[in-house]
Amino acid sequence: MEHTYQYAWVIPLLPLPVIMSMGFGLFLVPTATKNLRRIWAFPSVLLLSIAMVFSVHLSIQQINGSSIYQYLWSWTVNNDFSLEFGYLIDPLTSIMLILITTVGILVLIYSDDYMSHDEGYLRFFVYISFFNTSMLGLVTSSNLIQIYFFWELVGMCSYLLIGFWFTRPIAASACQKAFVTNRVGDFGLLLGILGFFWITGSLEFRDLFKIANNWIPNNEINSLLTILCAFLLFLGAVAKSAQFPLHVWLPDAMEGPTPISALIHAATMVAAGIFLIARLLPLFISLPLIMSFISLIGTLTLFLGATLALAQRDIKRSLAYSTMSQLGYMMLALGIGSYQAALFHLITHAYSKALLFLGSGSVIHSMEPLVGYSPDKSQNMVLMGGLRKYIPITRTCFLWGTLSLCGIPPLACFWSKDEILSNSWLYSPFFGIIASFTAGLTAFYMFRIYLLTFDGYLRVHFQNYSSTKEDSLYSISLWGKRISKGVNRDFVLSTAKSGVSFFSQNLSKIHVNTGNRIGSFSTSLGTKNTFVYPHEPGNTMLFPLLILLLCTLFIGSIGIHFDNEIGELTILSKWLTPSINFFQESSNSSINSYEFITNAISSVSLAIFGLFIAYMFYGSAYSFFQNLDLINSFVKGGPKKYFFHQLKKKIYSWSYNRGYIDIFYTRTFTLGIRGLTELTQFFDKGVIDGITNGVGLASFCIGEEIKYVGGGRISSYLFFFLCYVSVFLFFFLS
């Protein structure tokens, strides 16, 4: 056992050989390396699989009750200062190791087929393998300075992958947005680390937790300074985990390839912020003000993310706001001290969200032959619908992932979300109300995504191409170059100016028999157009979906309570028992059957109500409800109907425009900073340069005058002599 722990440092380094091999291959024999590029996927998956085996072995030992293991190397800079670095294996580390390696392996397998036709295939695998290495290094770090080092590497890899198709201006802009937004949080994190080093003289977790347990309660250190430094640490997690108000980068990060979206949202970048708060939770617990602030930010984020997802048309962007909302649940759980519930939801959400993102990648892959490679079309749910007939395996996987995120038992997210809701009600009714209401919203917008994508009919064949922009005749290839679309313009929709209602009246107004006429039609000129239909992706892309489906079905069992001779336990609570975090889970985590059933009924009822409302407005039964004039039967009379319409319009506008937060940031910060730079430029050019140029010009003019006076003319000498005498006499006589 001890022998296994001694070699745990190998886990983060295992993916590095294939990264270096690809780099040397591209440098020394680029042609051969590119021709054999598909071969590099196998060693990438193999090495990460070895890391997964190590991680599983360590996790089994942690579950069986092993103690915490920490190994440190010391680098002595001088007699007064030494830098320690090493690795730490505890329950939190083992959980994150399994999460990163399992999801990472499945994403690599999926990417081999998804990115097979991309010119940047090797570059993608280098980035994603280094991404996994950086995240593995982050979770095994034993002190804050190591965490910050790998924190920056994780951010760097995410920026490279978000802007992977850098020839597309919108992808380059999304990369810059993610970089600038995270710079705010990373700068705060660095200041917080330096602040605690100044307070304690150490960056080790043991020393920080010792101070949190002993010094802070006894007022032996400046509490105000400690709160400020803790807030700065939390600021880093706010940016990395897309919490309000630094969440604006996450939806734009969808400009990267879909596999990396799955990895970022499931097990790497956004999970890093949750991991940081979980790792430092003993420090934050000693500061009640910071804990209250964490729970407040989490509550705002979970509600905001849910409302912004209500009216999005892009399937990946909708899932991105869903991730933002679920991260808010985790942050809320950590803020109220529900450590186990937060980690439980981190696990269940990771597998469910990876399933949904990879499923959306299969949907996009199937739509590209119809609409081209432009993300504005291939990811637009307005053009989808009826895909259950063409990609049934993807549809089944996506449906189970959707139901899991909605909180339907016995799927994974039901168990973790129900635990968070129960603890929220016990901590504060305010948090409980918002968290429960958002659970209903989650069911609504997630089932909306499913219905718009898979239910009804394939709408792309029944839309008129109405764009007048020249760019609409072009599509974006897999590697970002503009190419002419080989798609019939009679059934391609440009949605740049078309309005889609919050409740999709415009999506189902089609005769019931039109579905039988799909196939071909003749235009007025007599030309016959044959439609292209979506198709299921290859087995390489379907295999990760099926594995993630199994995880979504059964991973929730680790949090199900079982009775033993001592009391109620779960596999997860047994796993987390020997924790370095020096605190115990609150007693309310162990609940009786009646309380569990009561909480479950209320949360499932909210989820089912959200599903019903979504099906009522977006399902195939919408035409039936519309014929019954069901809405108008509830909203009779002019004023009430007008109020309902205006409310619906306001909600749609709020959601579709991202809560106007991006607009506010653009006008306040972007335009404000631009105006300040223009003012600075004017001051620099007009005042500073004016003074400098004025001095030079004045010197030149004076020199010319002196030169003219000293030219040997007697009249000039007499004139200046009389002037000097006059001035002298004036001052002398006065």
Curated annotation (Swiss-Prot):
InterPro entries: NADH_UbQ_OxRdtase_chlpt_su5_C, NADHpl_OxRdtase_5_subgr, ND/Mrp_TM, NU5C-like, Proton_antipo_N. It is a multi-pass membrane protein. GO terms for biological process: ATP synthesis coupled electron transport; electron transport coupled proton transport. It is found in: Plastid, Chloroplast thylakoid membrane. The chain crosses the membrane at residues 9-29, 39-59, 89-109, 125-145, 147-167, 185-205, 224-244, 258-278, 280-300, 327-347, 354-374, 396-416, 425-445, 542-562, 605-625, 714-734. Its EC number is 7.1.1.-. It comes from the Eukaryota. It holds the Pfam family Proton_antipo_C. One of its GO terms (molecular function) is NADH dehydrogenase (ubiquinone) activity. Belongs to the complex I subunit 5 family. NDH shuttles electrons from NAD(P)H:plastoquinone, via FMN and iron-sulfur (Fe-S) centers, to quinones in the photosynthetic chain and possibly in a chloroplast respiratory chain. The immediate electron acceptor for the enzyme in this species is believed to be plastoquinone. Couples the redox reaction to proton translocation, and thus conserves the redox energy in a proton gradient. PANTHER family: NADH-UBIQUINONE OXIDOREDUCTASE CHAIN 5. This is NAD(P)H-quinone oxidoreductase subunit 5, chloroplastic.
